[in-house]
């Protein structure tokens, strides 16, 4: 079965509930099916599906190797959830020139769901296949606040090449991975190193764990003006500071892109959010429903060791309130505002929102208090 049909079937299963999914992931599935219908029925629709391009990225990952765990050394076979997003990134094309439809991609999911592996595989693909196809030198940067963070994706790319038949196509040093044929390369950037990206010309920028970035410094680097197929890629987990741009800007904006009742449209931004729904973490009893953990863990909840580790984190969080914030953010991909000895329950916070003030306040005095 072709990737296109597989993705359509997957999307329908998520929407129907056959595959446990959160509201926003269902919205992402609905968005794909709407696009598919336009492609199939509307000759004026500006995008088309390129099955060969979609299969190419699937085959690419199969040539790379798992770097750790019980699958270490084995080919990377993309899961249904990974195909749903990655095949869309490369499969949807512009009719006017055949180039990629999506210039930006945002994925938010709980930890240990192969985020770094995905970013690394795509980075290697960009400096090899995409650079060769477009006959250009592609500069790809992995950006992180800390030095160690910026090198996570870089190091993962190195490890995934070990034992791979693709290894001979690349020159790997401690600071750069170079595709020998095109001269394209991957480099890590970090604020801690004093490398802000000034003077770079990125064809692709991978912002890792954006929830930790206090500013949009790397996000604002911009992509190379002369690049034929630029790509800004963000894969992150929820964080503990609601004033950071990942929450105030990206998560909020991307949620509106997915929301079918929103007037926000961005046809060149691929978005997927896998999180616990607000009604799922309002009380401990529902929070402990392991079936619901699948919503934020489309990969980790599919194998026993992953389930056991989330289960263990939950037991600790129940007994020690100080650990609840970490459990919600890292294991269930829920945004919280961290406080000393606790957390702000965002479900209750959002429940306070009203679209219209229920009483007539005209002429009334208003008093505002601040707890500094």
Predicted regions and their residues:
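Phosphate/NTP-binding elements of NTP-utilizing enzymes
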Residues: 2-370
């Amino acid at each position: 079965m072709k990737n296109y049909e597989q993705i359509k079937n997957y999307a329908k299963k998520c929407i129907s509930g056959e595959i446990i999914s959160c509201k926003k992931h269902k919205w992402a599935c609905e968005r794909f099916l709407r696009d598919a219908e336009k492609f199939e029925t509307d000759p004026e629709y500006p995008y088309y599906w390129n099955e060969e391009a979609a299969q190419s990225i699937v085959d690419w990952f199969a040539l790379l190797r798992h770097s750790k765990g019980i699958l270490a050394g084995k080919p990377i076979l993309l899961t249904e959830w990974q195909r749903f997003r990655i095949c869309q990134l490369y499969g949807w094309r512009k009719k006017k020139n055949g180039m990629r439809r999506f210039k930006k991609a945002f994925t938010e999911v709980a930890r240990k769901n192969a985020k770094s592996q995905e970013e690394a595989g795509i980075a290697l693909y960009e400096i090899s296949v995409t650079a060769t196809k477009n006959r250009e030198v592609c500069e790809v940067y992995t950006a992180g606040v800390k030095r160690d963070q910026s090198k996570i994706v870089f190091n993962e790319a190195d490890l995934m090449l070990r034992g791979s038949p693709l290894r001979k196509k690349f020159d790997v040093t401690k600071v750069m991975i170079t595709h020998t044929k095109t001269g394209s390369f991957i480099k890590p950037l970090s604020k801690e190193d004093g490398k802000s990206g000034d003077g770079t010309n990125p064809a692709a920028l991978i912002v890792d764990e954006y929830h930790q970035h206090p500013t949009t410094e790397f996000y604002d680097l911009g992509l190379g003006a002369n690049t034929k197929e630029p790509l800004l890629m963000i894969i992150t987990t929820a964080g503990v500071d609601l004033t950071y741009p990942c929450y105030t800007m990206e998560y909020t904006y991307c949620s509106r892109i997915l929301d079918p009742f929103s007037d926000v449209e961005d046809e060149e931004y691929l978005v997927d959010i896998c999180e616990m729904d607000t009604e799922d973490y309002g009380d401990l009893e529902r929070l402990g429903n392991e079936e619901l953990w699948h919503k934020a863990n489309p990969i980790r909840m599919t194998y026993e060791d992953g389930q056991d580790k989330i289960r263990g984190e939950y037991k600790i969080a129940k007994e020690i309130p100080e650990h609840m914030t970490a459990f919600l953010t890292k294991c269930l991909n829920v945004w919280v505002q961290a406080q000393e000895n606790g957390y702000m329950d965002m479900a209750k916070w959002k429940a306070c929102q009203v679209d219209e003030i229920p009483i007539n306040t005209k002429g009334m005095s208003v008093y505002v208090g601040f707890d500094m």
